[in-house]
Amino acid sequence: MNTRRNFLQKLTGSLIALPLLSKKDYLESLNEIKSKKYDGPILRVAIMGLGSYGTRVADAMKDCTKAKLVGVISGTPSKITTWQSKYNIPEKNCYNYENYDSIKNNPDIDAVYIITPNALHKDAAIRVAKAGKHVISEKPMSINTKDGEQMVAACKKANVKLLVGYRMHFEPKTLEVIRMRTNGEFGKVLFFQGLSGFQIGDPTQWRLKKELSGGGAMMDIGIYSINGARYMIGEEPIWVTAQETKTNKEKFKDGVDETILFQLGFPGGAVASCLSTYTMNNLDSFFLNAEKGFAELKPSTGYGPIKGKTNKGELDYPHVTHQTVQMDKMAEIILEGKQPIVPVDGDEGLKDLKIIDAIYAAIKSGKKVSLSL
């Protein structure tokens, strides 16, 4: 599109993979995807892990143009039966956790979206890659850097794509803030604040079991502020400091963080101050302060409409179902070789894991920890 050329730039930030789109271009790209005239390739996806978020993704995929849910992998037979009926999944595309290696012999499945507890991502990704299928892992990509590196290596060896479910990387108001910052409309970035938290319920759920979650609030909700700081500032952090507090040691046992305050330093001088918590509700906001302006997203990562404003006024992009756009865009990445504005590949997931590892190390040592991403 001719108007797209207006935003072609030589970008220095590693977070930005493509020239950024104007509002008009973005809406045109969405309309192009939604066009009923589309007759290109379809990404055929099996979902592994049929819980609440897996259901959300499956429902969103009903409206996809370039991606289609065609298979399931679950350890619960009753869930498979329910999904077969609800989403019209053929028996030949249904697998359990023992036999899904045989997916390699199924030409009707292109990719597997892993939506299991965090600690299970690594082994599942390696098995899926060995079966020759593309891997989409829900965030966090894994529970630590070592496991993440093994996932990246396995997918490279198998010559398959590894993507991470960073739905906000395709959200229009988020992308508009990134466009404005990249174009220099805010001037030098000085400060970022990220608040990510909610009161978690059931104390027996897997998110509060270290052996399954790999941590606590940081792995689940705090990663949004890490990721947001990176793409809104447009640089990679070079140091981190962090402090942890716990008010309920029975619910939040050793290795399961309740509340963490952390700070990230960036090479251009900007500092991010972030909060990750499982104890406080109504915490879902990003704020960017710069020499010539500001940007605020509040809510910043929730499923409902994202709301945003800058020093130039309200951001009035239309609400989109995040997972629908995410899966259509991931289909373009896998099948057409397109690159997203903000990366969603395994290397991107690995950077967040390195920062999380450094945050935990900073808490343990009480010292500033250097980063090299």
Regions found by a protein language model. Give the residues of each.
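Beta-loop-alpha module in the N-terminal Rossmann-like domain of NAD(P)-dependent dehydrogenases
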Residues: 92-154
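NAD(P)-dinucleotide binding in Rossmann-like oxidoreductases
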Residues: 250-259, 264-328
